[in-house]
Amino acid sequence: MGSDDTGGLFKWTIDALFNRDTSPSTMYDKQLQQDSFDEEIYSRPRASSFSDPDIYSKYELLRDEDEPDLLRPVSMNGLPYEKQDTNTFHARRARERRVQETPNIRRAPNPNDPIISKLFQVDEDDSQLNTNEMRSQREKFNTGRLPGKFPSPTKQYNARISNRDAFTGAERKAASTAPAIPPVAPSVQNLDYTPEYVKLMDKLSLNNKELRDLKVDVRERQKHGMEKETELKKKYLQIRQELIQELKQSKMIYDNYCKLYYKYKGVKRSIQLPTQTLASNSSMLDKIASLEKQIVDLSIEKDRLKKKSEERILSVELQKKELENKFEVERMIYERRIKDLEEKLYVHEHPIRPATDTSPVSSSSFMPHTQETSDSTASPYKEYNNTIDTQFLRNLVK
């Protein structure tokens, strides 16, 4: 009915609806038969299995890359390649590991699950039922307490037969001829699971909020990391450019040093030292003596010229001072002469009138002050003679 790719989905649905002994989740339960001497399962390999390695080795075929055997992790039990567990339902058991890692595959509800126990109020005593008899009894009479479990119309729930071998042939015949008792379905409890669902939704909301906060935090950290990486990259490029400039400058300095060194060696080779001593070379000594004499004469001449120039400078400065004094005296004489002429002009333009008895104030009071002092007090520069000062300065210079 159902293929191996879907895991027998139709068969699982039929088993769940009609309350068969086989549960859809039994293939995921790790219930392996154990021997007394070893926990390994040694099964006979099937000759008709297409995954038999003998077929590939016989016909020199390449294995399919999508084959589950290739994608399966490496076995750590140390068995050789020939002894593989390849019984009929080995593929289903091996697919258990892959199914557990796949969250999209839906499983039948398990009463041992703590969430199922909390939602549907499964007793702790019921969760500890591990024997086959108690498990089958729980599946028969408590199927209405889990979603997906419905009462089967073909089974009688009131007739519980524990041992079929205890009936005799007559009893079986009487039971077969008796009228059939209609099956009575167990009463289904109407429980309100709203608070549990609300709590679960609240937890999911909190988890979603924490996931969003975590996502925002991760984005901020990623953004900060990218900014820091950009800044470090910028600094790295800057330091790299500085290093390149320093290397170029160091190379230039080294090249210049090499040039100077080779130039120094060339100059050193070009200079030929004299083979004779200076004491034995009279011409060189005479030349040195003449040069020293010339140096002395030039130094004496230099001192004489320096002294002469200083005397010349002093005489020029004295002449300059003499001329400045002369110009100052002449300026004062000219200023006094101009002032006298201005006074005479004023007297000529304003003659003095005789005083009368009627006039209360004399007209002489309106004359300027210069007129009063011109006749009464003689100016010291009026009869000035610059010959005396000139002669005095000349004697001072000498």
From Swiss-Prot:
User: Which segments carry the region annotation Disordered?
Assistant: 93-115, 351-382
The record's subcellular locations are: Cytoplasm, Cytoskeleton, Microtubule organizing center, Spindle pole body
Q: Which residues form a coiled coil?
A: 201-350
- Principal localization reads cytoplasm
Q: Does the keyword Coiled coil apply?
A: yes
Q: Where is the composition biased (Polar residues)?
A: 356-382
Protein name as it appears in the record: Spindle pole component BBP1
Record lineage: Eukaryota, Fungi, Dikarya, Ascomycota, Saccharomycotina
